[in-house]
């Protein structure tokens, strides 16, 4: 079975396993901690989710599905995973979140677009950062031939859908639309605009090289890979460990300073800046409104703090909660279900969602595909972590399509927004053109 479904097909009618042999045996065993789950991955087609050296990395495909477009793509993905996980015979000696069968996913930003994909890797390494490491395998354990890594070479850069001058025009039109809405009593307050950039290398781009470079340079971010989508996102959309849930909301950005004093001054100015704090408040409110009804407890920090990355500072707010107990015969919301419930946040779409989405489609003149959509993993217990696919690129052979953007409010300046987007391209540009 290919695992690829067409519109109108749930993908649940047949055997979800690519081997086509029905239920598979899954085994998770504790192994010595190597200190790096990204070291020595045998092939370029990998899945990964790593932060501070802890996380998951795997290869091969035991099962795969590409979901049809639609608002129900998260629900369809959950149903397919439940069908797959229920037919596995599991031996789990570790019993932590991320052990047993695990699926990785990358979902489209826009429900009207195709391309949301779930992959269950055939081999998966895990490490919790507290001295425990494990290996999960589907079926018999074999020896995978190691394909040598090849760093990108001969990289050439090309403009994407909107070259810089036209993107500045799009930002100006967004600002005008927001101001007009305010004058006329409308509800549009923020829209997030993005642009793309292409890189072409002399040979197919190896995701393993990019992952290691990103993880080394941005340890505070979540370095990820799934179906050719590779990046290092600073934004945790949702994490679920049993009933405990958490998120990290980011919106509002300024550069790092050249000296400690300059850096502190830039950070203080960001915390006091009306445009950026307004943008951040919309993002926090959207998370509260979507996650709050699903929780019996929800704690949101009273004000943003600074998240300092190597090249940028962001306004950040931590959100923590406890899921509401399910009713009779019900079950807790899974990590994937929660990701679907909170996406898209105002941090990547705008306020209100529907109006902002319409303006994005009008002004960006491109398909974001899976940029700014949920990316992450979920295990058979429904635990998992999903980030927002930012600071990333979609790999396709010798080509990489990079994305970056920012939140536009009434006080936004097109030239400043372009400069911010250029800085947000830097992690992937540096990883590709080391």
Q: For each predicted feature, which ranges?
A:
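Contiguous alpha-helical scaffold segments within structured protein domains
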Residues: 2-33, 39-40, 51-79, 140-176, ...
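A short, Trp-centered hydrophobic/proline-enriched beta-strand micro-motif
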Residues: 44-51, 102-104, 189-191, 219-225
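Glycine-rich, N-terminal phosphate-binding loop and its surrounding beta-alpha-beta segment
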Residues: 50, 57-120
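An anion-binding catalytic pocket shared by soluble metabolic enzymes
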Residues: 58-65, 114-123, 195-282, 293-299, ...
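Short, solvent-exposed loop/turn elements at beta->coil junctions and helix N-caps
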Residues: 108, 227-229, 375-379
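A contiguous, mid-domain pocket- or channel-lining segment that forms the substrate-recognition surface
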Residues: 118-145
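Conserved hydrophobic core element of enzyme catalytic domains
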Residues: 323-434
């Amino acid at each position: 079975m290919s695992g690829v479904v067409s519109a109108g097909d749930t993908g649940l009618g047949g055997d979800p396993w690519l081997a086509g042999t029905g239920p598979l045996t899954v085994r998770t065993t504790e192994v010595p901690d190597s200190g790096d789950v990204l070291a020595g991955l045998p092939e370029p087609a990998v899945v990964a989710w790593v932060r501070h050296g802890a996380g998951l990395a795997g290869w091969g495909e035991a099962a795969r599905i590409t979901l049809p477009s639609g608002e129900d793509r998260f629900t369809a993905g959950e149903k397919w995973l439940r069908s797959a996980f229920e037919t596995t015979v599991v031996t789990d000696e570790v019993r932590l979140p991320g052990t047993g069968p695990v699926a990785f996913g990358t979902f489209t930003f826009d429900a009207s677009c195709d391309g949301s994909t779930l992959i269950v890797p055939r081999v998966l390494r895990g490490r919790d950062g507290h001295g425990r490491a494990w290996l999960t395998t589907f079926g018999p354990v074999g020896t995978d031939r190691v394909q040598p890594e090849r760093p990108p070479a001969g990289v050439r850069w090309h403009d994407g859908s909107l070259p810089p001058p036209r993107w500045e025009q799009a930002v100006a039109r967004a600002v005008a639309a927001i101001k007009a809405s305010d004058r006329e009593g409308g509800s549009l307050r923020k829209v997030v605009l993005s642009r793309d950039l292409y890189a072409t290398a002399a040979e197919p781009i190896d995701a393993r090289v990019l992952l290691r470079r990103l993880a080394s340079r941005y340890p505070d971010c979540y370095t990820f890979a799934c179906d050719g989508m590779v990046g290092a996102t600073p934004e945790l959309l949702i994490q679920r460990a049993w009933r405990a849930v958490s998120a990290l909301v980011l919106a509002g950005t300024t550069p790092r300073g050249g000296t400690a004093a300059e850096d502190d001054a830039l950070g203080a100015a960001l915390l006091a800046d009306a445009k950026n704090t307004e943008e951040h408040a919309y993002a926090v409110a959207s998370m509260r409104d979507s996650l709050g009804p699903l929780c019996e407890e929800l704690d949101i920090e009273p004000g943003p703090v600074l998240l300092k990355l190597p090249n940028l500072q962001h306004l950040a707010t931590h959100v923590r909660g406890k899921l509401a107990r399910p009713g009779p015969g019900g079950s807790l919301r899974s990590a994937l279900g929660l990701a679907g419930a909170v996406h898209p946040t105002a941090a990547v779409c705008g306020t209100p969602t529907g109006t902002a989405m319409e303006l994005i489609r009008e002004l960006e003149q491109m398909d974001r595909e899976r940029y700014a959509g949920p990316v992450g993993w979920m295990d058979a217990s429904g635990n998992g972590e999903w980030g927002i696919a930012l600071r990333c690129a979609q790999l396709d052979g010798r080509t990489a399509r990079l994305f970056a953007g920012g939140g536009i409010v009434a006080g936004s300046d097109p030239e400043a927004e372009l400069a911010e987007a250029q800085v947000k391209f830097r992690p992937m540009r540096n990883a590709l053109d080391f």
